[in-house]
């Protein structure tokens, strides 16, 4: 598992980044292992502010507002592929997380910032692996995977 983290948003102090990196690596690696049954994956994670994620959301999704997480898969699902992708090429893609959204949501949901940040990284990873939440059945399947990952790494609600 290789995770490249880009700290574009500077509100997280340098001395906290090491422990956050470890938690993010655990969450993403566990999501890949449980969902793709693989230990090999390469993911790029960029932590940004609301202004930057708003810009990306507008430019790439046509949604003119900030969001918490965006995922950009390097390989898109084709109609002849299964619902959950199984890559021979382990380059999964990019995840962008708004640190501001993560902080606000942690307060709203009554848990730690660390838990929310890792949850968003897991959520983004599952999108890279082909999960979606547009239909209720798919949403339930994705939520079960998210909760399984968060439970296994000890970051429960």
Swiss-Prot record:
Family annotation (InterPro entries): MetalPrtase_cat_dom_sf_prd, YbeY, YbeY_CS
Name any cofactors this protein relies on: Zn(2+)
Q: List the disulfide bonds.
A: none
What is the species of this protein? Desulfitobacterium hafniense (strain Y51)
Which key words tag this protein in UniProt? Cytoplasm, Endonuclease, Hydrolase, Metal-binding, Nuclease, Ribosome biogenesis, rRNA processing, Zinc
Q: What is its EC number?
A: 3.1.-.-
A GO biological process held by the record: rRNA processing
Location in the cell: Cytoplasm
What is the name listed in the Swiss-Prot or TrEMBL entry for this protein? Answer: Endoribonuclease YbeY
Positions bound to Zn(2+): 123, 127, 133
Instruction: Tell me a Gene Ontology molecular-function term this record carries.
Output: metalloendopeptidase activity
């Amino acid at each position: 598992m290789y995770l490249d983290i880009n700290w574009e948003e500077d509100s997280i102090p340098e001395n906290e980044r090491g422990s956050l990196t470890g938690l993010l690596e655990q969450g993403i690696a566990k999501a890949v292992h449980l969902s793709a049954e693989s230990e090999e994956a390469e993911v790029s994670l960029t932590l940004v502010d609301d202004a930057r994620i708003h810009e990306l959301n507008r430019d790439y999704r046509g949604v003119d507002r900030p969001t918490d997480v965006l995922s950009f898969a390097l390989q898109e699902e084709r109609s002849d592929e299964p619902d959950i992708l199984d890559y021979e090429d382990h380059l999964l893609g990019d995840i962008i997380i708004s640190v501001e959204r993560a902080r606000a949501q942690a307060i709203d949901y009554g848990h730690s910032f660390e838990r929310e940040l890792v949850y968003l990284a897991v959520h983004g990873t599952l999108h890279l692996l082909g999960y979606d939440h547009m239909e209720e059945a798919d949403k339930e399947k994705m939520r079960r995977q998210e909760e399984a990952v968060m439970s296994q790494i000890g970051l429960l609600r």
